[in-house]
Amino acid sequence: FETLYVPAANAAEATLCPEVRVIPVTSVSQLAAHLSGEAPIAPQPRWEPAAPPAAALDYRDVKGQVQAKRALEVAAAGGHNILLIGPPGSGKSMLSKRLPSILPDMTREEALEVTQIHSIMGLLDRDSPLVTVRPFRSPHHTISIAGLTGGGSTPRPGEISLANKGVLFLDELPEFKKDTMEAMRQPLEDGAVTISRASGSVTYPSDIMLVCAMNPCRCGWYGDPSGRCHCSQQAVDAYMGKISGPMLDRIDMIISVPALDFAELRENTPAESSAEIKKRVMAARAVQQARLEGSGVTCNARMQPGQLRQYCALGDEGAKLLKTAFDRLALTARSYDRILKVARTIADLDGSAEIGPKHIAEAIQYRSYQLGKQ
């Protein structure tokens, strides 16, 4: 078709469809008058998207936490899910909220896909209908399963789909209901969520980076050198036990974010900016896209078993190192695969075609955090 009649409120976004004339309509009577020639309606001017705005949040503003920033750079470069564990005030939320500032800009296809989902929920800006910035969604821990994964008598997308092509941030992870967390497992694995009703089913995309943050215990100070934590080991285990093994298996990287000491807080040396980190992330993503071209996969975190075998071969030293970690950490097969994917990303950031022992060692480090152990 060449002409599209749409509600005036949706006319600007409709012009994103190429080679279609969009007529904005406010009522049926107005449409009838237009079709009869009595009162023609002018076509909606085509909306041209501007360049994405500069990120408001920047890693330059975060003091210290060099290791955490490195881990988030690796996560961004490969699209890996990550869990940050640390005491209150250590910067977990600050670090997480700045992650979109180092992610690659969305392609037009990605922007259109995100825009479609946000349009369903009425979240678009009428003056700027194309979503050009990767979403960052941070639902409260009281959210329901339907609110998180989607639902309703007329199926609507949940937060996991509203975060599609962006970041879903779950702060205070153990405070989420267990069944709510478990409901995310399949959408995380499949990159899509299907909502079934008697009248049929609807599938929404859920291609996200999952970023989670939590305290190491209920009071928040377990393992801190200050000795402020008075939680029993049983209480710590119960707190950590709120996160199931299968859920942890879907998180590629687990890192500690310790409290800053006085010297770090007083440090005035400028931190690296998000723009500088983003350049390295984009270079690594370009390598992955070239390697995986034509496969339907665009980043290391989404590699399938056959691609793992093809692109994540290890030398003898690297294989020996990984076997030692596998035995000592009692890793699952899924955890083993995730270490390989993270190691592949670290090698890409390093500009290396081969995964070396140092890449494996760093990837193991991101998997070796023992929940509930000092």
Question: What annotation goes with each model-predicted range?
Answer:
Residues 1-83, 90, 196, 335-336, ...:
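Peripheral, non-AAA+ core regions of ATP-driven protein-machinery
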Residues 4, 168, 252-255:
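Short, well-ordered beta-strand core segments
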Residues 43-44, 84, 107, 121-126, ...:
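Active-site phosphate-binding and catalytic loops of NTP-dependent enzymes
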Residues 73, 129-130, 134-135, 146-168, ...:
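Conserved alpha-helical scaffold flanking the Walker A/P-loop in AAA+ ATPase domains
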Residues 84-125:
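Walker A/P-loop
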Residues 110-144, 151-152, 258, 298-306, ...:
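Conserved inter-motif catalytic segment of the P-loop NTP-binding fold
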Residues 154-155, 178-374:
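Basic, amphipathic alpha-helical bundle interface domains used for macromolecular binding and assembly
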Residues 165, 171-172, 183:
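Walker B catalytic acidic pair
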